[in-house]
From Swiss-Prot:
GO terms for molecular function: structural constituent of ribosome. PANTHER family: MITOCHONDRIAL 28S RIBOSOMAL PROTEIN S21, SMALL RIBOSOMAL SUBUNIT PROTEIN BS21. Belongs to the bacterial ribosomal protein bS21 family. Coiled coil: none annotated. It comes from the Bacteria. NCBIfam families: S21p. This is Small ribosomal subunit protein bS21. InterPro entries: Ribosomal_bS21, Ribosomal_bS21_CS, Ribosomal_bS21_sf. The gene is rpsU. It comes from Alcanivorax borkumensis (strain ATCC 700651 / DSM 11573 / NCIMB 13689 / SK2).
Length: 71
C-alpha cells in the first residue's frame, strides 16, 4: 500500500495526487478490478496468452518501423 507523508504547508490536493500516482504505479486499482469477478483458470490463461501475442505483434511492428526509418 503506497504511503504519502504530507509535508508541512503542502496542499491536500498535491498529497492526494501523489497518493493516486503511487496507487497507480503499484497496480492496486487494476488488481481490484481484476478480482471483482472470479475468472476460471482457463480463461485467465487465454487472456494472458492473448496479451502476450498482442505485445509480441506490437514489438514486431515497432522493429519494422525502426528498420524503415533507417533507409
Amino acid at each position: 500500500m503506497p504511503q504519502v507523508k504530507v509535508k508541512e504547508g503542502e496542499p491536500f490536493d498535491v498529497a492526494l495526487r501523489r497518493f493516486k500516482r503511487g496507487c497507480e504505479k503499484a497496480g492496486i486499482l487494476s488488481e481490484v478490478r481484476r478480482r471483482e469477478q472470479y475468472e476460471k483458470p482457463t480463461q485467465e490463461r487465454k487472456r494472458k496468452r492473448a496479451a502476450a501475442v498482442k505485445r509480441h505483434l506490437k514489438k514486431l511492428q515497432r522493429e519494422q518501423l525502426a528498420r524503415k526509418r533507417l533507409y
